[in-house]
Amino acid sequence: MINLIGKKTQIACGLLCCCSMAYAQSNDNSEVVVLNAGWEFSQAGTELWRPAQVPGTVHQDLIYHKQIPDPFYGINEQKIQWVENEDWEYRTAFTVTPEQLKRDDAQLVFEGLDTYADVYLNGALLLKADNMFVGYTIPVKSQLRLGENLLHIYFHSPIRQTMPQYNSNGFNYPADNDHHEKHVSVFSRKAPYSYGWDWGIRMVTSGIWRPVTIRYYDAASISDYHVKQLSLTDQLAKLSNELEINNILPQ
C-alpha cells in the first residue's frame, strides 16, 4: 500500500469534476464486472431457492414471490415480523475468463451489505461483515478459478445476532423509534428506521442493498482519494490532493 500526497496546486474548479469522472472509468489496464444478475435467495435451513433482486432486500424478494403480504397495507406489519428472526442466504455464479485470470490482481467489492453477513467465494470464507454503512473490498485473486465461480452470502438475523448484548446489558436503552419492547437496535450499525419510527413500520431486513462488482487490474489501482480545498477566491481554488494506491509490483 502506497500513499501519494500530491503537491498543492491551483486549478479551476471545472478540472476537479473531470478528475472525479475519470476516476470511475475503466481503461486497458483494468476491468470492472457488475455482479448484480443471477442471484437466488433462500431461508436458511431450507433447500428452496428463488430468484432474487440485487441490489435489494429479503423483504422485497419475499413480497415479489408472494411469501409475505404487502407490509404497508392495513395491519400486515404484524404478519411479517417473523422475517427478522430468520437467517437468509444469497448466492450467484459468475464466469472468469482466461484473460481475467491473467490479470495481476482482482478485488471483490461490496458497496453495501445489510448487515451481519458471512461472504464465501468457492467455499472459502472471505469476510464477516457487521456494518451496513460501509463498503468492503476483498482481494480475491488467489480464490478465483477459471470458469464458474460460486459466491455465497449468509445473512444472520440482526435480532438474534444482537440479543446476547441486550441480555447482558441489564437495561433498555431509550431508543424510542424501536417498536419492540427489547431495544436491540442500539447495538447494530444498521439503519435505525428499519426497527420502526413514528412515520414508518418496523421491517428489520437483510440483504445486498448496494451493487456488487469484481475489479480486475494490472500493476496498481487507486483505492481511495481525497481532495481538500485550502482556499477559494472568485478566480482560483487552491487544493491539495491525496491518493491511496494499491501497488502489487515489487518495490
List each language-model region with its residue ranges.
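Beta-strand-rich binding/interaction modules
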Residues: 119-121, 236-251
